[in-house]
Amino acid sequence: MKLKVLNAFGVGILVSAACNFTNGQSIEDVVLNVYKEPTCGCCNGWIEHMNDNGYSTAFHHPTNIQKLKDEFGLKNEWRSCHTAVHKDGYYFEGHIPEKFIAQFLSAPPKGAMGLSVPGMPIGGPGMEMGNRFTPYDILLINKDGSHSIFASIKKASEQH
C-alpha cells in the first residue's frame, strides 16, 4: 500500500513539473528557459518574438530575479528585465533580436557566456512603440567577466 501511495505521489510531482512548461512541451523540447517578473509585458513580447522564430521557450517567475542573476554571474551593467538560459548553458540577457542569438549559437566564441542588451531600448523585440527606435549595442559577455560589442544596431531594420 505504501509503495502505491509513493508511486502516485511521484507521478503527481512529474505531472506538476511538466505543467510548468508552455504549449504542452516536454522538458527535452525547451531550448530557452526565460526568467522574468510575472507582470512584465515586454518580456512576453520578446518570448513571442523567439517563439515566432522557431524557438521553444518556458518561462519562470523566480521569487528574487536579481539574486538569480547574481547566481548566474550577470553583472549589473549587463542586466535587463529578463534572462534566458539556453539548453547549452548560454545566457541571453534582455531584448536581443533572434537573428543575433542564432548567429551566436552557430559559432559560440571561445570563453563566451552569452549576449546582453542592457536596459530596455525602445524598438527592440518586445519593446516596440510604433515607429520609435533607440539605437543600441548587443554585448558579448565572457566567462572572465569582460565584455565587448557583438553588434551595434543603428536602425530597426537591422534587427531582422
Set out the residue ranges of the language-model regions.
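Local sequence-structure signature of Cys/Sec-based thiol-disulfide redox active-site neighborhoods
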Residues: I27-I47, N53
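Bacterial N-terminal signal peptides
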Residues: A8-A17
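N-terminal, post-signal-peptide region of Sec/Tat-exported proteins
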Residues: N44-G89, G94
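Bacterial N-terminal signal peptides that target proteins for export
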Residues: M1-F9
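Thiol/selenol-based redox catalytic cores and closely related redox-interacting motifs
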Residues: E71, E77-H160
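Secretory pathway export signals and precursors
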Residues: V15, K36-T39, E77
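Active-site-proximal beta-strand/loop segments in catalytic clefts of secreted hydrolases
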Residues: Y35-E37, H60-P62, H95, P118-M120
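Bacterial Sec-dependent signal peptides at the C-terminal "C-region" and cleavage site
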Residues: A17-S26
